[in-house]
Design a protein with these regions (language model features):
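Acidic Gly/Asp/Thr-rich repetitive segments characteristic of extracellular carbohydrate-active
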Residues: 98-143
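Extracellular beta-strand-rich, repetitive "passenger/adhesive" scaffolds
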Residues: 115, 169-176, 195, 541-544
Length: 591
């Protein structure tokens, strides 16, 4: 690695790559003052950022002014609006799962049950028939798709009104992908399935997540593909509640949250921020997910309380696997699978790290760490850590292991967990690679490449990069932050890191694919195709039947369609022995 004052985008020669990565890991602590510098913007870029943020804030205020009266009206009619929620009990819970197969802290979210059905028919950023129209509306709502393709956002799309379900599995053909800007959740009772969020922008002006926001709670995310974020791919752990103009904002944990069967991969390292996720909250659970080819935060724990991390797969981390929390935090790390990749420094502590609890947020004059229950985790290639996760897999700041802290940290029984079906780590590895991400209506080529990299240990990359900004669009980057070739001067990895899985531009792994599909016939625009309604005795010319429940099982007719249920069969969904992913079992929505 060259001197900090010179260009340090060295080439990753495979012969000495591991030696350099060990050095990188050992120097990680010092990066806070030297290498982890944030990019500096030009004056013009700063002015652009200020102008954009003011415009976005104005737009959000206008959106909320229209939605708020509807939200308040529905609250008076039985759908409470609780923006200050900070405890799991602050939000009411449904009596049946958000959908069959929902598990964990968010499994009893209402989503948009019983609300208006919005059918997305346009890929435009805004206007009639768009995703933005549906998400920015007030009132309970369920969003289905009758179009396929890329929805390229021109500004962040923020969900402010509660009670929303987005059913990405209903898109025809190849499905949809949200690109260009952040998709954010700033409310409660949100259910999202089979959606792709790939921001994909590398301009230094706006370095944000692909999927995140200011989430309040009752969040149920299933089969999400979150990639190409410039900060993190997907983050849910806290929200800031503003009591009023004369009060300071209060930080509160996101409550009742689940992320399951999802992918957080290929965060963009253009400015040293290839980070997977910051997660946490109260009554939170994260299971059967994949974190792949993010340098750090795989994931980071951003809240105290009990952090449930079960049956996940982590691959090709560089300087951070999982870390965070404080002395109040409690961790359940159960039956996860860790696979070091080409850029994982296998000969350093981080190379076999399962979890590094931290104390920095505690603001104490002494070191005190949270408590950890860790069992059944596999560290591929490391028999010692696999046999005993505490033999090097659980680490603390500044030490290779937990020597001197183990007695305080180690728990021998799991902390209280919400309902989660748990499998062995090896079975979880196979399950995640076969099922994670937006697999319906079909898994796209980007996720196929991500999964194949994990299986083979070899990165997919294009052999000939584009001539224009092949390492990312760094227009707006101040001269003092630029290397000789115009890239970010203080980037830790070399320009060819994409050959080993860490990318700085989506084009390095092929860029956005095309998505095609034929719209379904839906005469009454109620989100249920005519053929499906006719088959099950509903009226294809009466939109009101979407919100009815033809068999009394608790799911409305539109929910029966989007979740692959047979309306002729009534099932007791309160009985968790019946709680399985009916949509996956059917292979998608019925045509």
């Amino acid at each position: 690695m060259t001197d900090n004052n010179n260009k340090n985008n060295y080439t990753l020669n495979p012969k000495n790559m591991q030696k350099k990565l060990v050095l990188l890991a050992l120097m990680a602590f010092s990066f806070g003052t030297t290498y982890a510098q944030y990019p500096q913007l030009t004056s013009a870029a700063k002015a652009r950022v200020d102008s954009m943020q003011k415009a976005w804030a104005k737009h959000q205020a206008e959106v909320w002014a229209k939605a708020e009266p509807i939200v308040k009206k529905e609250a008076a009619e039985g759908r409470p609006y609780v923006p200050w929620a900070g405890r799991p009990t602050d939000l009411p819970q449904a009596k049946i799962p958000a959908f069959p197969g929902a598990e964990g802290g968010g499994m009893y979210s209402f989503g948009g049950r019983g609300g208006k059905v919005y059918v997305v028919t346009s890929l435009a950023d805004s206007g009639p028939g768009t995703l933005r129209e549906a998400c920015e509306a007030g009132g309970a709502r369920i969003v289905v798709f009758n179009v396929s393709g890329i929805i390229r956002l021109k500004s962040p799309l923020i969900v402010q009104a509660p009670y929303l379900t987005i059913a990405g599995q209903t898109a025809p053909g190849d499905g949809v992908c949200v690109a260009g800007q952040t998709f954010g959740v700033d409310t409660h009772d949100v259910v999202i399935r089979h959606m792709r969020f790939r921001r994909g922008e590398t301009n230094v002006d706006h370095r944000e997540d692909s999927f995140g926001g200011n989430p309040v709670g009752n969040i149920m995310l299933d089969h999400i593909s979150a990639e190409w974020g410039l900060d993190e791919n997907i983050s849910f752990y806290r929200h800031m509640w503003h009591p009023g103009a004369d009060y300071k904002a209060e930080k509160r944990g996101t409550v009742n949250v689940t992320i399951q069967n999802s992918i957080s991969a290929k965060a963009l390292d253009t400015y040293n921020h290839s980070f997977g996720s910051t997660l946490g909250g109260e009554n939170c659970s994260f299971m059967r997910n994949l974190w792949s080819c993010n340098t750090g935060r795989n994931p980071s724990i951003g809240w105290n309380g009990i952090f449930n991390f079960v049956n996940n797969v982590v691959y090709n981390w560089v300087h951070r696997s999982s870390d965070g929390g404080d002395y109040q935090a409690m961790f359940n790390f159960i039956n996860n699978y860790y696979k070091p990749g080409p850029l994982t420094p296998k000969d350093s502590p981080v190379g076999h790290r399962i979890l590094k609890p931290e104390s920095g947020r505690s603001k104490l004059s002494y070191k005190q760490y949270g408590r950890v229950y860790a069992t059944g985790n596999i560290m591929e290639g490391n028999e010692r850590v696999t046999k005993d996760n505490w033999d090097g897999g659980i680490q603390v700041e500044g030490q290779r292991d937990t020597k001197g802290y183990t007695e305080q940290m180690r728990a021998y029984e799991p902390f209280e967990m919400p309902y989660v079906q748990i499998m062995g780590a090896q079975k979880a590895y196979d399950f995640v690679l076969a099922n994670a991400g937006a697999t319906l209506p079909k898994r796209d080529i980007i996720d196929e490449r991500v999964i194949d990299e994990v299986r083979t240990g070899q990165a997919y990359y294009v052999k000939k990069l584009p001539k224009d900004n092949p390492y990312g669009d760094v227009s707006g980057l101040a001269e003092k932050s630029q290397a000789e070739d115009g890239t970010f001067k203080y980037r830790r990895l070399g320009n060819d890191s994409y050959k080993y899985g860490i990318i700085t531009d989506p084009r390095q792994m092929g860029g956005y694919p095309e998505y095609h599909g034929t719209p379904r016939v839906d005469s009454d625009s109620d989100g249920m195709p005519d053929a499906w309604e006719k088959k099950y005795g509903l009226n294809p010319n009466d939109a009101s039947d979407a919100s009815l429940d033809c068999n009394g099982d608790g799911y409305t007719n539109i929910e029966k369609y989007i979740n692959g249920l047979d309306p002729r069969v009534k099932i007791d969904w309160r009985n968790l022995s019946n709680n399985y992913d009916t949509l996956a079992a059917r292979g998608g929505v019925e045509e």
